[in-house]
């Protein structure tokens, strides 16, 4: 039942321009106009969120959104969501509780006038559901969806803002159970905004916007806040960024020495040293790196991002945020004040964006950094600059790691987009800034009509730059070896608006502050040829900017103990130790320097509401969607894709769907009977003599470890009744099922290889059209084979004898060791189209045994 929409009153007030929203928030806390909580030595804000965007190329402020009053606080822990009414908005909070209880009655487990507890168990991940059904099943994200969809007559409201922990992934995917560590951020914590402040810095304008069912109280609160903002704007004080942030200090060449002078300590006065202590020592972290490399060699992952933390005192998190904002302005600046913790950061990298205006979702991976070619006087030496760009573009390791992240982003966007709309709008563009240049790509797609922005966000969790690939196996390794929850680190901060606008950033270059101490976490991207000591040093480089901001906020300089050798002559990030140009490799947990967001980039800046967006009254009730795009007449070739927990599965799905075929996705953790049932021809298919095609996806590890994979392949080979194509791990499963063996052939990840098409391949339906020219293919594997069993014929091999493609001599079974779906395989779509079309050709023998009858 859809409840009668609440009729909130909307109040807007143009107010005096506040150039520094962080200082304004401090002022409002002192005057009691925002929620506050007492901590030793001060009163700090609570239940507020500050989101800011800074153009770091010019250091000009762009946009600020501040949640000054919230109606409710939503906290997710596991499958439980607690919704609490906040004291400054009791009427609105009570209305929200009533709306949620009415819309989600089956999930209510406890209710008082001040609190509602919901339980939303996750959809099973045992493979029993087709993947689209699983993605759109009810989840703990439903309360956010429903509150954001309430009808308010204003483009900026309704709005929910907050943080998703890295560990939110474990609420809908099976990850090892680990204890809570120093970062106690819940799975998510969001606020339903009642009054927000929107600041447009380029026009030096600001507006208070509020919505409430208690119009009189809202008018009074907005008027109080307007007067306070005007009073604050008239206070004398240092000029802060209406157009430019203060110029940051030069990068230090190493840990500061006791007794060195420091700003704020007076001329010649020594600054105290504040020591940051690592949560994991050098030797232990290097051992973690080596363990990760063993997993890479075993074919479990292509890359993985372990992390460690650094702790130091932090009595005033908002002061630390101010220091970070001035020294390291970034596209995504954030400060979140919750009852038990504060979270601050300056992130350079978006997580997932959804534009309500265009209906597009986008991911922008950043990986690969070089210094600008600066001359002795600090100006750009264009000749040197060009040489450094060429070095960046041609560095095999940089390019391979960047391509891996691009293929991963293509997968995540394809999973939630209309087939055929996913595209790489920028591939390895070199963006230049004042001190560094980066490789940047962008992947966009049109969001599928049966999904919304929150579905897309869950489908893309977590970002590959903080996890690795394949994501799920990498996340399992991260949890097992780090041994505790990551909390906010590697999660996302941002907002969701009523029209569906979603703007989130990755929580990196951040500090989690609780009980007077800051925890700053940083990771290192581990690949096969990583140097463990250098990866440990990389975490120091990445944490330093935030640690220095925390120290400066206390009038101190930073000490950080052991300094390991540099990972690269140009170590990562704008904030590195020992790099006067602030340059680096920064391929994971990006530490880019200045980046100017594109006009459509969110960067915590509100974009215009979509003029054709549906109103909240048109929003469907939860649960609201099921299944894949239907094929009512049963005319399309049907492909049943077995997902072996890979991060490129939806690149295959999108490619197959653009060929006009219907795709159903089941996880390899499904019972074999579930997949066998999906492979049975429908009556319409039987009438046309058509059989579904089984597609075996890539995946981590050995084929024998991937659920029902081997059982299905053995049956397909034995019966010859199921046309089958295997990719990478799927190819290896075919080799094993036919009596061959796969083993280590050396890690090759994100690399293009030129292969030789054999005589059999030149006659094969899939490869014959391409046999006249070179065949360049993408490889992501550590396992493979150089010797095929008698039942398989090689179609393509590498120069060192690794088999890249093979076909069964009798059964309609073909395997590709390479990845046709990758951007590195130019002829991949043509190969897959020819292959699946050939396998799906109608047959006349309707008496062939079914796969079900053999098992």
Annotate each predicted stretch with a short phrase.
Residues 1-583, 587-630:
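Extended alpha-helical targeting/anchoring segments
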Residues 236, 372, 549-710, 715-718, ...:
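N-terminal beta1-alpha1 cap of cysteine-dependent amidohydrolase-like domains
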Residues 319, 506, 707-714, 796, ...:
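Charged helix-capping and loop-helix junction motifs
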Residues 491, 762-810:
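Catalytic beta-strand/loop cores that center a nucleophilic Ser/Cys/Thr
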Residues 678, 690-769, 776, 827:
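Cysteine-nucleophile active-site neighborhood
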Residues 788, 799-846:
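A glycine-centered loop/beta-turn motif at secondary-structure junctions
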């Amino acid at each position: 039942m859809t409840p009668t929409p609440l009729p909130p009153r909307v109040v807007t007030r143009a107010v005096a321009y506040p150039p520094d929203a962080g200082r304004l928030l401090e002022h409002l806390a002192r005057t009691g106009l925002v929620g506050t909580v007492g901590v030793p030595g001060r009163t700090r804000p609570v239940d507020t969120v500050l989101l800011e965007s800074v153009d770091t190329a010019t250091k000009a402020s762009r946009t600020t959104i501040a949640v000054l009053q919230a109606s409710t606080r939503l906290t997710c822990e596991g499958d439980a969501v607690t919704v609490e009414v906040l004291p400054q908005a009791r009427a609105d909070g009570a209305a929200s509780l009533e709306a949620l209880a009415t819309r989600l009655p089956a999930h209510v487990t406890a209710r008082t006038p001040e609190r509602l507890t919901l339980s939303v168990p996750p959809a099973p991940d045992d493979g029993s559901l087709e993947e689209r059904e699983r993605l759109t099943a009810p989840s703990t994200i439903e309360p956010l969806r429903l509150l954001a969809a309430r009808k308010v007559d204003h483009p900026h409201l309704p709005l929910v803002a907050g943080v998703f922990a890295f560990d939110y992934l474990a609420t809908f995917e099976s990850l090892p159970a680990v204890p809570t560590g120093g970062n106690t951020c819940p799975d998510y914590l969001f606020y339903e905004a009642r009054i927000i402040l929107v600041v447009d810095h380029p026009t030096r304008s600001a507006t208070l916007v509020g919505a409430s069912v208690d119009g009189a109280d809202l008018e009074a609160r907005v008027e109080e806040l307007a007067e306070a903002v005007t009073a604050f704007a008239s206070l004398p004080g240092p000029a802060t960024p209406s157009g430019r942030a203060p110029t940051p200090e030069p990068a230090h060449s190493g840990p500061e020495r006791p007794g060195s002078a420091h700003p704020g300590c007076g001329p010649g006065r020594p600054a105290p040293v504040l020591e940051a202590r690592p949560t994991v020592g050098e030797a232990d972290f290097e051992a973690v790196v080596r363990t990760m490399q063993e997993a890479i060699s075993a074919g479990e992952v292509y890359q993985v991002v372990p992390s460690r933390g650094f702790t130091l005192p932090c009595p005033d998190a908002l002061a630390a945020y101010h220091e970070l904002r001035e020294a390291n302005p970034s596209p995504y600046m954030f400060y979140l004040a919750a009852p038990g913790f504060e979270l601050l950061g300056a992130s350079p990298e978006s997580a997932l964006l959804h534009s309500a205006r265009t209906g597009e979702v986008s991911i922008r991976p950043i990986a690969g950094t070089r210094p600008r070619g600066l001359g002795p006087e600090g100006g750009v030496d264009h000749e040197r600059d060009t040489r450094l760009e060429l070095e960046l573009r041609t560095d095999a390791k940089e390019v391979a790691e960047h391509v891996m992240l691009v293929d991963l982003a293509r997968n995540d966007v394809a999973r939630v987009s209309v087939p055929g709309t996913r595209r790489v709008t920028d591939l390895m563009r070199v963006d230049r800034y004042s001190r560094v240049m980066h490789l940047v790509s962008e992947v966009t797609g049109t969001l599928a009509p049966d999904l919304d922005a929150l579905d897309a966000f869950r489908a893309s969790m977590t970002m590959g730059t903080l996890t690795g690939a394949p994501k799920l196996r990498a996340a399992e390794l991260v949890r097992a070896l780090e041994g505790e929850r990551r909390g906010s680190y590697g999660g996302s901060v941002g907002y969701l608006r009523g029209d569906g606008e979603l703007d989130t950033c990755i929580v990196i270059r951040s500090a989690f502050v609780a009980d007077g101490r800051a925890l700053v976490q940083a990771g290192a991207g581990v690949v096969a040829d990583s140097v463990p000591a250098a990866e440990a040093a990389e975490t120091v480089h990445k944490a330093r900017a935030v640690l220095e901001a925390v120290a400066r906020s206390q009038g101190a300089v930073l000490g950080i103990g052991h300094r390991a050798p540099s990972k690269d002559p140009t170590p990562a990030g704008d904030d590195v130790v020992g790099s006067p140009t602030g340059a680096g490799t920064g391929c994971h947990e990006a530490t880019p320097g200045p980046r100017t967001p594109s006009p459509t980039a969110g960067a915590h800046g509100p974009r215009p509401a979509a003029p054709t967006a549906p109103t909240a009254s048109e929003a469907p009730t939860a649960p609201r969607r099921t299944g894949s795009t239907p094929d009512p007449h049963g005319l399309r070739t049907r492909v049943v894709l077995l997902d072996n927990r890979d991060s490129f599965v939806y690149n295959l799905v999108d490619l197959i769907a653009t060929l006009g075929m219907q795709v159903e996705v089941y996880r390899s953790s499904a019972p074999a009977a579930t997949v066998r049932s999906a492979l049975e021809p429908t009556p319409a298919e039987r009438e046309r003599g058509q059989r579904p095609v089984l597609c075996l996806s890539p995946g981590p590890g050995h084929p024998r470890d991937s659920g029902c994979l081997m059982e299905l392949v053995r049956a397909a080979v034995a019966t010859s009744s199921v046309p089958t194509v295997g990719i990478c791990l799927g190819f290896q499963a075919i080799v094993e099922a036919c009596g061959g063996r796969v083993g280590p052939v050396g890690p090759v990840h994100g690399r293009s290889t030129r292969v030789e098409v054999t005589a059999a391949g030149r006659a094969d339906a899939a490869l014959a059209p391409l046999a006249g020219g070179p065949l360049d293919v993408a490889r992501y594997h550590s396992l493979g084979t150089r010797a095929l069993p008698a039942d398989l014929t090689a179609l393509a091999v590498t120069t060192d004898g690794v088999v890249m493609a093979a076909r069964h001599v009798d059964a309609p079974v073909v395997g590709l060791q390479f990845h046709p779906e990758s951007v590195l395989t130019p002829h991949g779509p043509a190969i897959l189209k020819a292959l699946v079309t050939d396998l799906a050709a109608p047959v006349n023998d309707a008496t062939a045994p079914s796969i079900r009858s053999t098992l």
